[in-house]
Structure formats: C-alpha cells, structure tokens
C-alpha cells in the first residue's frame, strides 16, 4: 500500500488462478487441458470515508472490466455506485480466491447474474445485515444499444452468533428483474437465459441452458445458511426463479440448491467478510478437506422449457500456504439428468488442480 498526498492511499492488486483438468470416464469426449480461470490486475484507493476499486480481468481469451465502483462508508452504512455484483446469493458474492472449489455450484452459476451497473445501500451491523440496490442490465464489457432491463435487489442476513471463530448466518434474498428490449426482429426480445458449465470450465460447454421467451419479468428468491465453529464450516443455499410470461404462455420456474462443508486438518479457524456477509478463506496457513453436493432442475414441462437437470458431488483438498498463495485439488462426479445440453446423460468425472495467488 502506497500513501499519496494527504489522506489518499493507493494499492495495486492482482490475482492469478491457474487450473488444469483431466476428465475421467469420458464418454462425452471432453477436452483435457489448462486455463487461467481468473487473471486480474487492479487498483484500490481510499480517501477519508471514500473508497474506489477498479479491476481488469482476462478470462476465456477475453479482456473485460471486473469491479469498477466507488463507495462511501459512514459507521455501519455503505453507499456504493458503479459496476459490481448484485446482493444476491451467498456464493457469488464470495471472491473466486476464497471459493472452496474451482467453480461456484451449478445452481448459483445458472441463477445469478454477473456484475452489473447500479447503486446499492448496505447496513452492516454485528448481528443484522441488510443490502438493497437498483441495477440496469448493462456491464462495461457488454454495452447494449437497446433499452436495458432493470433489477431491484434485496438481501437480509441475521447473525445471532458473530464472534471470532464462531458464526451462525441466516439469510434471504430476492431479485425482481425485467428483460431487455431488442432490435427489430431480434429473437432474444423479452427473453431470459439461464446457463451453467457445471463443475469445470476446462471444457466450457454449457450443460444447463434454459431459454425462456415472451417474458414480462422474473422473480428470483434465495435462502442461505452458514455455520462456522473453529475448524468446522458449513454452507448451503436454495435458489428459485419464476418467470412471468405474456398472455397465452405458461409461467416458467426452475430451482436447485447445494450444501457444502469443510474441516481444517491444520489451521485455526475460518475468516468471514462482514461487509459482504460472505465466507472468507481460512486464517493463516491451513490444510482443508471439503465436500459439496449440488442439484438443479431447469426443466419445466408446463412451460415447454427444457433447460436440463444435473446433480454433482465433489471432494477437495486445499492448502493455503499463507493469505496470498494456495493450491486446490478436487474430484467431481457429475450425474446429468433429463434434457442435459451438449452431452449424453452418462455420468462422468473430472479431476482438477489449481495454483492461486492474490495480492
């Protein structure tokens, strides 16, 4: 961190997540290989009660703007404006560096948006947390020349236990979103799309892909639970979406959830980001054993939408050398369901290794 004139302080930031993966029982001819899952360079600055963050990322052979926002903090109150994640779902708000596995659960990837431009207000108390915001459907990497949809988000968290090494976190969130308009003749007019690549992006086919047209709005709801006690950690969410469609079209619904737990074989305890109300990495040097089960169903017979269904189970071992450097090894067993996309419905597995460094 480099002090500048007056109270202004600046800090360069960086992140590198390098993955390698091998698919086993590979009837779908998945491609093995390596990739940069996340590669970033950015800057953070603070001035009195103000802060700013800007990051540029490289993912999938594409350079894009990640976080780009300013925030004003006064005691327990935070006002934020710019491009950042909407306050919805526990795992999506978590830093990619702090994820227990290589990807967020499939249901989180399918039912959450990326960063969007907007503004939010957050109350961050010791036991009570509330965040709400207004967002457009635009981001700096996808500027649209059409009338953008908008979203109104809200998230509430109750933390009856919130002390060092001990946490009980219970939360709920909701999003109301309207679709984008479209250029004349555009087939994506008034359409919502839900998609997920599953447990890995080494082969980046979308296993889940639900396209819901003739949409008026969508309402997404989620509930979340997090428990931490010294070396033990438990996290779970259930998420549902409902799309209200135009007259003569049946409404659509998709849903799913996950539960994951972990245990520190070495190390003291787990961190917790109170400002975002989301999990952090283990404190100091640590060796972690973790497991996760994820399920999602984006098929809806009444609406005539077949987005696919999937279950998967993952086991992982993570080693955190310090707060900057770590390695992750994970094995995932994937059980495709009805109407899975781009592949057969035969079970398959994948082994992944990650080296990660953050500054």
What function would you assign to each model-found segment?
Residues 2-140, 144-180, 258, 263-268, ...:
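Outer membrane beta-barrel
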Residues 27-28, 186-359:
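Outer-membrane beta-barrel pore domains
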């Amino acid at each position: 961190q480099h002090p500048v004139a007056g109270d202004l302080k600046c800090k360069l930031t960086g992140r590198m997540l390098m993955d390698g993966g091998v698919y086993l029982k590979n009837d779908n001819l998945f491609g093995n290989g390596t990739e940069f899952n996340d590669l970033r360079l950015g800057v953070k600055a603070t001035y009195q009660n103000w802060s700013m963050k800007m990051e540029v990322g490289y993912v999938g052979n594409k350079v894009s703007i990640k976080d780009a926002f300013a925030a004003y903090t006064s005691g327990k109150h935070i006002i934020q404006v710019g491009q950042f994640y909407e306050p919805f779902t526990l795992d999506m708000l978590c830093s990619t560096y702090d994820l227990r596995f290589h990807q967020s659960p499939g249901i989180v990837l399918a039912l959450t948006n990326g960063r969007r431009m907007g503004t939010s207000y957050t109350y961050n108390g010791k036991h009570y947390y509330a965040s709400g915001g207004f967002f457009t459907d635009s981001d700096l990497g996808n500027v649209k020349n059409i009338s953008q949809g908008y979203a109104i988000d809200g998230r509430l968290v109750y933390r009856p236990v919130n002390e060092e090494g001990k946490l009980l976190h219970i939360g709920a969130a909701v999003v109301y979103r309207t679709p984008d308009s479209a250029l004349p003749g555009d087939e994506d007019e008034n359409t919502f799309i839900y998609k997920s690549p599953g447990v890995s992006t080494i082969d980046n086919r979308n296993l889940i892909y639900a396209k819901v047209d003739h949409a008026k709005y969508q309402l997404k709801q989620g509930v979340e639970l997090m428990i931490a006690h010294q070396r033990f950690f438990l996290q779970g969410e259930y998420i549902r979406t409902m799309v209200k469609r135009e007259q003569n079209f049946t409404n659509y619904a998709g849903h799913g959830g996950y539960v994951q737990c972990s245990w520190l074989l070495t190390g003291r305890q787990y961190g917790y980001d109170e400002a975002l109300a989301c999990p952090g990495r283990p404190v100091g040097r640590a060796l972690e054993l973790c497991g996760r089960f994820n399920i999602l169903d984006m098929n809806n017979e009444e609406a005539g939408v077949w987005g696919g269904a999937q279950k998967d189970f993952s086991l992982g071992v993570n080693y955190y050398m310090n707060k900057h450097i770590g390695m992750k090894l994970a094995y995932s067993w994937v059980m495709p369901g009805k109407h899975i996309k781009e592949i057969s419905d035969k079970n398959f597995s994948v082994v992944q290794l990650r080296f990660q460094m953050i500054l």
